[in-house]
Amino acid sequence: MTKKLTPQEKQNRKPAVRACVFCHQKHLQCSNERPCKNCVKRNIGHECRDIVRKRVQYLTGNGKGSSSKTKTPRKKLKSTPITASSPSVASTISPLPIDAGLKQEFSTPNEIPMSEPSLTNQPLSMSPLNPQGANNITNNFNSHATSQQIKEILEVPPHVNSMMNNSGLNTNVSLTPETLMIPDHLQFHTTTMLNTTNDVLNKLLTDQFETESLISANNSNNTSHNDNFIAQNNNNNPEPSNLHNRHQFSSNYLNEEYLMLGDILLHSKPVSPSPSNTSASEYNTNTLSPTNFGFIQNIDFEGFNQPKKKVAKKLKESRPFISLGYTDDSTLRLNHAPEANGQTEDLLDHNKDDSRKNPGNGNSIINFETKYVKDYVAPFITNGLYQSVKDIYSYQIINYEYPDSYHALTKFLKERFGGNDLSIDERKEKRSKLLVILKLIASYRPTFIAAHKSLLKPQDLLFLEMSLQRSLLDYKKLVELSSSPSIMWRRTGEIIYITEEMGLLLGYSPIEILEKRFFLFSLMPDEEIIRYFKFFKNIAVNDLQSSISIKVKLINKEGRLVEFCSVYTIKRDIFDIPMLIVGQFLPVM
């Protein structure tokens, strides 16, 4: 039984770098000295020695030899040429290395009939230089020598390979009509890479019957011309190509994945036209296509693509369809780049959309044509006009212009912080305070403008004004019941209601304040104005609090400061923008 250690001993104790044999077997805490304390305590100090650790396998050196042995024959396999005992086969594949022999299985359709009898009837006998590699190549050729594999190889359109071979390594350029119709090989590769999705969809949607019908029609109409043309190209450039292999994948999940990717890339419309998100086919109009070659112009490709379209339609109806952005059925169509910006703005601007439609009689209660008034109406008039909820829906709704109110606020602040009759230092101080206030206003006003930009004018603006007047009636009743000195103002700071109790504390009558455009900041000193705008900036955008309690100082009519403990209640509109602010003020005696 080991001794129980104190916390101080546990803290000072450090593990040994390497344990001895006894401590390792007994799972004891060993020490760095030899003999260790455990062995001395048990009188076996003469047997105390370090435990021998097992060496890691990758440090023993056995793995390098085995890996080097396995790599050597693989290098020899790639450099060993292939020879065939059959004369017919030897003429085609004997001088080629293994890499070229592997490419032979993807040869063009015109090369297949020349070597088809030898591939199917005569077995291949390889050179005994490398029996293992020869057996692999023999099995590879025998596995692809069936008629089914030949049909899959024939899926490559013959004109594609011939055109590639003709434009690849031929240095003698002639300006004949046939060569002028041949596209550049660099342009072909670029188009193939950009139109990857089209190739994938063609691979998945093209049936074997459609491919055979295309090849048979092509061979029957242009047999003599194509044979001579392709044979000449094969002699000049024997390099095979398989750029359009259209057989389906063996995995159903992989097929579904590529179909979904095709939906996203082909059937989705970009939000804004740009070279990065525009289809590559729109920029490559003169690329490799069946209509660019004269010897296949008689083929009806539109009729050939009809079964493919039916298959695509069935696939879309039988599986989930994925699309990003706006589809072809959307009202926002960005087919023409010059009109794209205007179309986007029309979608967001309800005024342009509804101007094309017949507005009809509209609301029988509210006549928007006669009630859209831009002239300023004092709050004293509106308070006398809307004394009940029924009055809001019966009488004329007078629109409120917030831009005009902000312009009036800016003019008031410039006059307040102008300081024309002050000294230079005081004038600079006033100007610095004005810049602070204007920066605070500029920080939240763009948010208000963006929220009201998509409104339907004047209907939405009148609706917001009706909501404000409706909320104002409720808060008036609440203030009358509480009998607390209160002031109500818009988000611009314009006072729209003041109780008689508050007027008595400040020395103003309610009519004096409500008969004109009167801002709350006229009752505040300079420091309180800056403090208010800092507070309003936080509640306007970031903090969505409904009530805040602060201390504030107001200036009465005689010019003296009166300290209040105030509570601000913020009423927001449908855009979460402060619409009405109710301030209840209790004087601090």
From Swiss-Prot:
Keywords: DNA-binding, Metal-binding, Nucleus, Transcription, Transcription regulation, Zinc
Top-level taxonomic group: Eukaryota
SUPFAM superfamilies documented for this protein: PYP-like sensor domain (PAS domain) (SSF55785), Zn2/Cys6 DNA-binding domain (SSF57701)
Keyword hit for NADP: no
Compartments in which it is found: Nucleus
Region annotated Disordered, chain positions: 59-90, 218-240, 340-362
Membrane-crossing residue ranges in chain numbering: none
Domain PAS: 471-542
Function: Transcription factor which regulates nonfermentable carbon utilization.
Family designation: Belongs to the ERT1/acuK family.
This protein's name: Glucose starvation modulator protein 1
Source organism (scientific name): Candida tropicalis (strain ATCC MYA-3404 / T1) (Yeast)
Gene: GSM1
